[in-house]
Amino acid sequence: MKNTILSFLLILFTTNAFSQENPIIYFDYVTVLNTDVEKHIEAEKNVFSKMHKEQIDMGNKIGWDMWQISNNSYGEPTTTFLYVHIQPGSGFSNEPSKIFSEYEIQEHQKQYADRIVKTGNLTLSLKGSYGIKPGQKPFNYLVTNYMVVDPYKSYEYEQMELKSAGPNYAQNGRLGWGLAKVISRFGTDHEVNYLTFDFYKSMDEILNARSTTIKFTKSQMALWRSYDKLRELKNSHIMTLIAAER
C-alpha cells in the first residue's frame, strides 16, 4: 500500500496534463491515526502546501485545499482529510521544485506514506458554482453532500440544481455553492454520481441550519418532493478548512 501511495505522490508532481474548458477536480481522502494528526497537518502546511503553491504560480494547477472532516463516528481512532486538487485539465502538469531538493521531497513523501491508514479518491467535473470561483480561496467551512441520481435523469437534475438551488445559495447562511459530477466511477457498485457543496462562514451557521425545523407550505412541500424524485442524499460531510493555496 505504501508503494502505491508513493507512486501516486510521484505522479502527482510529475504527470503531464492537457487543457480543458471546465476545471477538473480531484478529491483525495486520506485517513491517519488521531495520534498523527498534528504532525500530518504540520507537514502539509510546511512542505506540501508550498509545493502546490509553487505549481500554481507556474500555471500548472488552479488550486489546492486541505479539509478536515469533522463528523467522524464517535470514538473513531482515525481522522480523515480531504485534499482538493483543482486542475485546468485531466491530469497533473508539474515542473521540478525549486524550493525543495529531490532528496527532501522523497523523504517527506516517505514520512507521509508512513502516516497513512487508508486512502480513496474521486474525479469530478465542476458543473457550476455561485458565490465562489475555482480560482478563489474557499470559505472556512464546507458541507459536501453525496447524491445518487438516476443516469436517465441526470440532465433534469443538473438543471434543477443550477437553476433553482444554486441561485438561492444565500439561504440558510450559505456563502457559496457548487455542483460537480463524478466522472471516475460508474456502475451499480458506485451509486454516488453527484456532489453539491455548501460553504459557510462558521460551524455555528452549519449547526443552526441543521437544527432549524421548517414548516413547509403545500406548494413548498410539493416543490421539494419534486426535487427528491431526482436525487437521493446518501451522505454528508462537515469539513473545516486547514490550508488552501491559489
Region roles according to the model:
Residues 19-246:
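Short S/T/G/P-rich N-terminal loop/turn motif that feeds into the first structured element of a domain
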Residues 1-22:
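Bacterial Sec-dependent N-terminal signal peptides
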